[in-house]
Curated annotation (Swiss-Prot):
CDD domains: Ribosomal_L18_L5e. GO terms for biological process: translation. SUPFAM superfamilies: Translational machinery components. The keyword Nucleotide-binding does not apply. Keywords: Ribonucleoprotein, Ribosomal protein, RNA-binding, rRNA-binding. This is one of the proteins that bind and probably mediate the attachment of the 5S RNA into the large ribosomal subunit, where it forms part of the central protuberance. Part of the 50S ribosomal subunit; part of the 5S rRNA/L5/L18/L25 subcomplex. Contacts the 5S and 23S rRNAs. Residues 8-18 have a biased composition (Basic residues). Gene3D superfamilies: 3.30.420.100. It comes from Mesoplasma florum (strain ATCC 33453 / NBRC 100688 / NCTC 11704 / L1). This is Large ribosomal subunit protein uL18. Residues 1-20 are annotated as: Disordered.
Amino acid sequence: MKYTKQEARKRRHYRVRSKVSGTAAKPRLNVFKSNTNFYAQIIDDTTGTTLVSASSLNLGLKSGNIEAAKKVAEEIAKLAIAKSIVDVVFDRGGYLYHGKVKAFAEAARENGLKF
């Protein structure tokens, strides 16, 4: 039985999440992409709280393309640095490091986040 793309992504995400977790000193930068939007959160897994979040919905962008991912990365980096969060652990959410996810990661690094 072949897994669908969504099932394969969820399996990858569960496997990665068993190894990756964020702390207060180095929180987890999580990404999620839907068909129309791109979302990112910085999460402290020890307390289970979201420290910073940004999405293409909040920015008023009409699509979830590569340019939207870059703008979300700029916004989340700006918000994180304002809360003195610089070092993070990148959780790509089971997605392949390609396209929107890669553009997001590179833009976040360019704007001051370290991972």
